[in-house]
């Protein structure tokens, strides 16, 4: 017998095919889709389905269920960091952030990461597997059900490289954007990447106008290769060229994420070099005071250096912001909670 299907990972079209195989009417697919996207975890809770259909459905399918292992709530601004256990026992993280315009969730796309970025805690214990579309969607549903707050923005910027899990991430984008599901507009979704050029170009053709966030973190290849091994495959010039094609195709502004690391990439000369490379592009730069990860040796730039860097970029017409620091009293780099649990067998926070 084939393995059971996760209803949360299925499109309405896939559910329609399942209903046809089961000898059921097509409209049942939409009902099931609406139930799963409300966060229902029990097929028996689908009260507009007959008991007979529910029993048959349980033989063929299940609903993905995340378990909240731990959550940390900021006393300063209400930011919540979640540690989730997956069905197979693997661990991922998500974060809920509150802004003036509403709630934003930062979700994971993989268990671990292959990319090896030196300043990131996610890559420290290696790559395990990709997340399914349902596991990505369930992060949003579980947070919404836990907090009773509707999430208005999603950033796929947690553990993992989203474009390394391309097919599942794109399917997730279509699921979360569906009018009969969460119905989150594509313009309220950001997809982060360290710069997988072929996948950036593929994403441009998907006709899902999400915001693309590039983890750039350096003004030149020499510095970037020290902290991001992916740069040996895809240089900054190649990434920028792909970004220009993305903006031309989608008419969406690119965000360049830039972690400010003391003494490495934060000089006035670095700012000038970056400004000259990207001026005139439909883009904006988000400066990030780097998180401290115990074994990297990296320290965040001073406030004065960050301000000077920002002013130089703006002088060249590059729109620039400094990421607002949320949850500073529960501060941990993305992936740090999972890493502590995997390496030490306990939560060290």
From Swiss-Prot:
The protein's required cofactors: [4Fe-4S] cluster
Details of cofactor binding: Binds 1 [4Fe-4S] cluster. The cluster is coordinated with 3 cysteines and an exchangeable S-adenosyl-L-methionine.
Keyword terms, alphabetized: 4Fe-4S, Cytoplasm, Disulfide bond, Iron, Iron-sulfur, Metal-binding, Methyltransferase, rRNA processing, S-adenosyl-L-methionine, Transferase, tRNA processing
Broad class of where this protein is predominantly found: cytoplasm
Alphabetical GO biological process terms: rRNA base methylation; tRNA methylation
Annotated binding of [4Fe-4S] cluster, by residue: 113, 117, 120
EC number(s) from the headed UniProt entry: 2.1.1.192
Residues in Radical SAM core domain copies: 99-329
Keyword Metal-binding belongs to the record: yes
Molecular function per GO: 4 iron, 4 sulfur cluster binding; metal ion binding; rRNA (adenine(2503)-C2-)-methyltransferase activity; rRNA binding; tRNA (adenine(37)-C2)-methyltransferase activity; tRNA binding
Binding site for S-adenosyl-L-methionine: 160-161, 192, 215-217, 291
SMART domains: Elp3 (SM00729)
Catalytic activity: adenosine(2503) in 23S rRNA + 2 reduced [2Fe-2S]-[ferredoxin] + 2 S-adenosyl-L-methionine = 2-methyladenosine(2503) in 23S rRNA + 5'-deoxyadenosine + L-methionine + 2 oxidized [2Fe-2S]-[ferredoxin] + S-adenosyl-L-homocysteine; adenosine(37) in tRNA + 2 reduced [2Fe-2S]-[ferredoxin] + 2 S-adenosyl-L-methionine = 2-methyladenosine(37) in tRNA + 5'-deoxyadenosine + L-methionine + 2 oxidized [2Fe-2S]-[ferredoxin] + S-adenosyl-L-homocysteine
S-S bonds: 106-334
Pfam families noted in UniProt: Radical_SAM, RlmN_N
Top-rank taxon, per record: Bacteria
Localization (cell): Cytoplasm
UniProt miscellaneous comment: Reaction proceeds by a ping-pong mechanism involving intermediate methylation of a conserved cysteine residue.
HAMAP family named in the record: RNA_methyltr_RlmN
Primary role: Specifically methylates position 2 of adenine 2503 in 23S rRNA and position 2 of adenine 37 in tRNAs.
NCBIfam families according to UniProt: rRNA_mod_RlmN
Family: Belongs to the radical SAM superfamily. RlmN family.
Record-given protein name: Probable dual-specificity RNA methyltransferase RlmN
Gene: rlmN
């Amino acid at each position: 017998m084939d393995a059971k299907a996760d209803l949360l990972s299925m499109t309405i079209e896939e559910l329609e095919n399942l209903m046809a195989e089961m000898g059921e009417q097509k409209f049942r697919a939409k009902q099931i889709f609406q139930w799963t996207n409300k966060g229902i975890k029990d097929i028996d809770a689908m009260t507009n389905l007959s008991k007979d259909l529910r029993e048959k459905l349980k033989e063929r399918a299940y609903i993905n269920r995340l378990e909240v292992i731990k959550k940390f709530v900021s006393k300063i601004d209400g930011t919540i960091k979640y540690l989730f256990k997956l069905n197979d026992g693997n661990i991922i993280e998500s974060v809920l952030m509150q802004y003036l315009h509403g709630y934003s969730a930062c979700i994971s796309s993989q268990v671990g990461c292959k990319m090896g970025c030196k300043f990131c805690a996610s890559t420290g214990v290696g790559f395990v597997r990709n997340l399914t579309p349902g596991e990505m969607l369930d992060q949003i549903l579980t947070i919404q059900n836990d907090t009773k707050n509707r999430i208005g923005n999603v950033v796929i910027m947690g553990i993992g490289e989203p474009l390394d899990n391309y097919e599942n991430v794109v399917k997730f984008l279509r699921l979360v954007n569906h009018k009969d599901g969460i119905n989150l507009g594509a313009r309220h979704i950001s997809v982060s990447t360290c710069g997988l050029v072929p996948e950036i170009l593929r994403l441009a053709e998907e006709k899902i106008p999400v915001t693309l966030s590039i983890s750039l973190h350096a003004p030149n290849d020499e510095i970037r290769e020290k902290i991001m091994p992916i740069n040996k495959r895809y240089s900054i010039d190649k990434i920028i060229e792909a970004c220009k094609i993305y903006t031309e195709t989608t008419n969406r502004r690119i965000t360049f994420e830039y972690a400010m690391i003391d003494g490495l990439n934060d000089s006035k000369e670095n700012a000038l070099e970056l400004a000259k490379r990207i001026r005139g592009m439909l883009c904006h730069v988000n400066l990030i005071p780097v998180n401290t990860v115990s074994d990297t040796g990296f320290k965040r730039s001073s406030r004065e250096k960050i301000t000077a860097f920002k002013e130089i970029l703006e002088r060249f017409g590059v729109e620039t912001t400094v990421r607002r620091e949320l949850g500073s009293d529960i501060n941990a780099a993305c992936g740090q909670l999972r890493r502590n649990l995997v390496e030490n067998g306990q939560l060290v926070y």
